[in-house]
Amino acid sequence: MQIAIIGTGNVGATLARGWAAAGHEISLGVRDVRQFKGKSLLEEKNIRAYPVAEAVSKSEVLLLSVPPDVIPAVARNLSGVEEKILIDPSNAFRGRPEGYANGFEALTHLTRCRHLVKAFNNTGYENMAHPAGLDTFVAGDSEQAKTVVKQLAEDLGFAHCYDFGGSDMAPLLEQLGMAWINLALIRGLGRNIALNVIGI
């Protein structure tokens, strides 16, 4: 699958490596290919860097892994994403997009994407690199998009990817991510914890 990733911080880089290792073709959307600082990513098989517009145009799936407060600026410069699968992994921990409650709401209004999903926001990037036995979740109105993202989660090695509901459940899924942040970072349990669904 052709996957574009905008934002190569911890989450974006980790997912890029994981999906590339699973055989997906990863296009990193960057401002300046020549001055891109993540050169180590480009040493990985199946990962290449392109200008943002080119990376997006090549993709079937787009992961927008940038801080929530810059999502509006990035989203306003995206074009041709209405029919792509757009993944929002953001949690508004250190700032919100101006004029919006969260990144998902901003992307809904600014991109008009029909296949927007919330996913990969409920655990730390270290766990995303080694997710065996861990659960993750996806929310959105597009059943097609959720099916694809569930498969992408399995490709990374997650044990399960649960359907969390429609777009109206995206804010609640973000709160689940905030719960992980609270336990891991604020309450001091450490980043190597996970929130799993366990039947009793």
Residues of each region from the PLM?
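Structural/interface elements that position substrates and couple domains in central-metabolism enzymes
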Residues: H24-S27, K37, P97, A159, ...
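A glycine-biased structural micro-motif
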Residues: G38, K58, G80-E83, C113, ...
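NAD(P)+-binding Rossmann beta1-loop-alpha1 motif at the extreme N-terminus of oxidoreductases
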Residues: M1-K39, K45, Y50
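Rossmann-like NAD(P)-binding element
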Residues: N46, Y50-G80, I85, P89-A92
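Short, well-ordered alpha-helix to beta-strand connector turns
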Residues: G23, K58-E60, C113, F158
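Rossmann-fold NAD(P)-binding glycine/threonine-rich loop
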Residues: S90-H130
